[in-house]
Amino acid sequence: IVGKTEEGKSPIILLHGGPGSTHNYFELLDRVAESGRAVIMYDQLGCGNSFVEGHPELWTPETWLNELCALIDYLHIDHFHLLGQSWGGMLAIIYLIEKQAKGVKSAILSSTLSSSKLWASEQHRMIKFMSEEDQRSIAEAEAKDDFSSEAYAKANEHFMLLHCAGEVTKDSPECLRRKKRAGAEAYLYGWGPNEYTPTGTLRDYDYTDRLGEIQVPCLVMSGTNDLCTPLVAKTLYDGIQDSKWHLFVGARHMPFAEQNDEYCKVLEEWMEEKEGK
């Protein structure tokens, strides 16, 4: 928990991606606490400070939904903003629709999705813009259900550099350089071997037709070069009654890292607006 919440403001809970990506990158949003609201982040079960492995039966949406509910109860939080990035946004959508919990001032759906099928389709569309060699390596790996080849690894790395994030260097923020205990098992059994082949427990995730059940205002944020393509983001925007969409030009899957100033400004203005300030 970073900072304290001033009277008239609500804290913000951050849900990281993956599953299994850890909270580390969210430390880039510590500065949000300077405006007088606590920023709450945690490592979901299966990674970081909550690392567990050898229990593939755990890696279901229900596990992480129950964990989020337990966190909110434990901290006695009765009003808050909820930000989910990538998989974390999927978890936020599940929470908002299945729990219909009171006290959520707003939700921020950052580079996320309402349908695994649409997500996979869009990733495959973008793969077609890659070199023929990379396309062939990915297609062969998927056809054989074998993602162990060096050619596939290189192709997947190229894809992620294009649409997820750049390489971490000595000049990157410390929270990105810091060694993390990623949840490889949680990712594999929860999502799949990569971003475009959902084979895990989230493979049939689809809340597109239920987005209208979300009763809180939602800010959709994504990048033009994002894994969360404009079509994926627009599907969220179109389906949620009270929604706004901010598109970061030139950003990949983590606009809060690549365009931190703009991201924090948009985020803070949104939360203040929803608190009636």
Question: Language-model features: where?
Answer:
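Conserved HGGG/HGGXW glycine-rich cap/lid loop of the alpha/beta-hydrolase fold
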Residues: 1-53
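Conserved catalytic-core motifs of eukaryotic protein kinase domains, centered on the activation segment
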Residues: 24-26, 50-56, 119-121, 231-232
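Active-site loop/oxyanion-hole signature of alpha/beta-hydrolase fold enzymes
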Residues: 44-87, 91
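Conserved hydrolase catalytic core segment
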Residues: 78-122
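Flexible "cap/lid" loop of the alpha/beta hydrolase fold
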Residues: 105-146
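Alpha/beta-hydrolase
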Residues: 129, 136-216
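Conserved loop-alpha-helix segment in the C-terminal half of the alpha/beta-hydrolase fold
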Residues: 201, 208-251
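Catalytic active-site module of serine/aspartate enzymes centered on a nucleophile-bearing elbow/loop
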Residues: 242-277
